[in-house]
Amino acid sequence: MATAAGMGIGAACLVAPQVRPGRRLRLQRVRRRCVAELSRDGGSAQRPLAPAPLVKQPVLPTFLVPTSTPPAPTQSPAPAPTPPPLPDSGVGEIEPDLEGLTEDSIDKTIFVASEQESEIMDVKEQAQAKVTRSVVFVTGEASPYAKSGGLGDVCGSLPIALALRGHRVMVVMPRYMNGALNKNFANAFYTEKHIKIPCFGGEHEVTFFHEYRDSVDWVFVDHPSYHRPGNLYGDNFGAFGDNQFRYTLLCYAACEAPLILELGGYIYGQKCMFVVNDWHASLVPVLLAAKYRPYGVYRDARSVLVIHNLAHQGVEPASTYPDLGLPPEWYGALEWVFPEWARRHALDKGEAVNFLKGAVVTADRIVTVSQGYSWEVTTAEGGQGLNELLSSRKSVLNGIVNGIDINDWNPSTDKFLPYHYSVDDLSGKAKCKAELQKELGLPIRPDVPLIGFIGRLDYQKGIDLIKLAIPDLMRDNIQFVMLGSGDPGFEGWMRSTESGYRDKFRGWVGFSVPVSHRITAGCDILLMPSRFEPCGLNQLYAMQYGTVPVVHGTGGLRDTVENFNPFAEKGEQGTGWAFSPLTIEKMLWALRMAISTYREHKSSWEGLMKRGMSSDFTWDHAASQYEQIFEWAFMDQPYVM
């Protein structure tokens, strides 16, 4: 059997298993090798180097050095010329006929064989993307490992969609150990790589864990600050006081990971596309510009900032800037001054550092999670103090609507539903509605419109408007169900309202994934009166399940829900109702239009359902748009001071 070294780039990841793998496993190995070959031919990743020279090369920065340096490999005498070995596919010994096969074709083809079949796959045809790249996602959370909101859904699905299109993708996130999450990282192994990061008054050692899943390299940064009870960012007493320190470590580690981690036998190298998500990862573009490019490193790399929620910016006192380990001249990139009304006292100058602002200044491209939100962040109302800066970068600002995972959210296969249905056969939806009414203890009435709400119980989601509108709605012949938790005052209101309207209202305090699926499938209408919504996922889930959304026309809700117009051409009559401005009167008007259509115009209602179910909100669609952003980023020179 040929050694990994003899096989060349990527061969180390093709190790023969003890049991013959299934077709899916073989194709996964082939895809990974395809990316390896494309990286070698296209120059998007460097050929693996010995670890010792990686540290000693003068062009690399010296502020981060691996704490252990393996010995350099010894030189062995050159062997006698022999034909190139056939790469081991991991499925046993094969002896294909190589007659007439040229050296060029050997570089371009991969053999996959089993006892029954032998296939030849062309490397260039394996990738769906026109240009494949090495993509590094940096995030504070990613499903299924750790998740607190929509950010985790995006960073758990978009990397997989890009990998399936032929890109080599790494996700870098913390390795949270709080007891409940420990099992999620059980399949990640210790890479034996660790570095010391100079920041916050000392050198802090972090280690790397790795799991290869769904064609993506999931890299977990390990440090004691990620090992504590509570949620990802805080506990019952509020946000952790050292969050700035925790995510500074993450950003430094993410910059080093492509240079030192030999994943599948070779590093990602310097020509990477960094996709940094929200403030937790926003120091990455600053580090690339301030601490790497001056040393000649990452000059071919680019960065894209993805803003999921501009309300969270990572603002800390200005006195913490020296702790970040950045040169003094870079303070202006992160400088933030609070308006006078937000200062604590008359002597407060309002000076602070803002992680997200640093990324807005230094990132090569900026993406928001919907087209509407990309406009809103440039306005005084939606810009959260960064509107002028974001307006100055309009030329590199774009919006891309998030996708949904159709493996988890598909009414024809959903494991949480009692009955399945599809756009071609909607009979199962009525059965799901009856089962939901039975589960909630509501009267089983197929003729009564069932309205649902799923989300946090707070001011941003418009719960106060629902609370004021419920007495008026309960006079109508409808049923209403709410699922969520949050403000204790709203939780108490839900309980008391349920006791007052036993046959019409149900409030489920808390959150349950199975129940959320059954509410999405069983309801006729989903209400989302959010004050602002960068993207929103529940309206996408609702349309996928044939549930008609009634939403406030803001951000991603306005982008994804098309207003019903019965006089439009066939196929363009809309998918729901988007009302504006956000008032009780407008919300009630939109709901009553939906209720009237449900009762009196069954054919129009069925058209609304089917158009929503036929909409393309897959992650593959979103991934193709991100590829265009990557192309634009590489057209321009990177940020330098």
Swiss-Prot record:
Q: Enumerate the catalysed reactions.
A: [(1->4)-alpha-D-glucosyl](n) + ADP-alpha-D-glucose = [(1->4)-alpha-D-glucosyl](n+1) + ADP + H(+)
Q: What happens when the gene is disrupted?
A: Decrease in average length of amylopectin chains. Reduced content of amylopectin chains with a degree of polymerization (DP) of 8 to 12, but increased content of chains with a DP of 6 to 7 and a DP of 16 to 19.
* Pathway assigned to this chain's UniProt record: Glycan biosynthesis; starch biosynthesis
Region Disordered: start and end of each range? 62-96
Misc. comment: Three forms of soluble starch synthase were purified: RSS1, RSS2 and RSS3.
PANTHER family assigned? ALPHA AMYLASE DOMAIN-CONTAINING PROTEIN, GRANULE-BOUND STARCH SYNTHASE 1, CHLOROPLASTIC/AMYLOPLASTIC
Q: What is this protein called?
A: Soluble starch synthase 1, chloroplastic/amyloplastic
This protein's species is Oryza sativa subsp. japonica (Rice)
